[in-house]
């Protein structure tokens, strides 16, 4: 499945489909804790793919009838990444691509719920804009997450493939690097 957050859907209206290579498109999952997902979002297109919206029992939304609505708790104002992965696993999804923005990726990273992190560096200077990945502050550098990584050149861009699997725990709490 491919997963994204409501911010990315509202900002970019992604299709979340496979287009540049052959192969089937994955199921689409949107995290929408407050019921803000428009029924016209392209991620909800009725094209035979399974579509899920992860929300809360309190959230009011008007989703198409064939979209699976999964109500999850949000004890700290957000749905916990570990709860999201558990709910998806219960529904048969064991490989998840998080194609979200900085907020969604940051929350999964901080919770220790990522096996891999791909960071693309492009030779462009944007200046001011939305923040990138943000994590809780650390007191010392030895508390930082450090992951083995591979570097791939993609034309003018560089992809950093960071292996976080050694720092991922079953309960979703990241281990410190050693």
Residue ranges and their predicted role:
Residues 1-178:
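Enzymes that bind and transform nitrogen-containing heteroaromatic metabolites
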């Amino acid at each position: 499945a491919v997963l994204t957050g409501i911010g990315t859907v509202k900002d970019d209206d992604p299709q979340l489909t496979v287009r540049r290579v052959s192969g089937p498109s994955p199921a689409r999952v949107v995290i929408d804790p407050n019921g803000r997902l428009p029924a016209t979002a392209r991620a909800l297109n009725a094209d035979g793919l399974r579509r899920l919206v992860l929300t809360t029992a309190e959230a009011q939304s008007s989703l198409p009838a064939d979209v699976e609505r999964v109500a999850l708790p949000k004890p700290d104002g957000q749905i916990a990444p570990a709860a999201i992965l558990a709910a998806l696993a219960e529904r048969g999804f064991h490989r998840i691509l998080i194609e979200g923005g900085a907020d969604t990726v940051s929350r999964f990273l901080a919770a220790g719920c990522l096996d891999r992190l791909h960071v693309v560096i492009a030779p462009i200077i944007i200046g001011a804009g939305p923040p990138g990945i943000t994590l809780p502050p650390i007191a010392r550098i030895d508390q930082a997450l450090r992951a083995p990584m591979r570097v791939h050149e993609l034309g003018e861009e560089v992809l950093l493939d960071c292996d976080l699997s050694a720092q991922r725990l079953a309960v979703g709490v990241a281990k410190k690097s050693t």
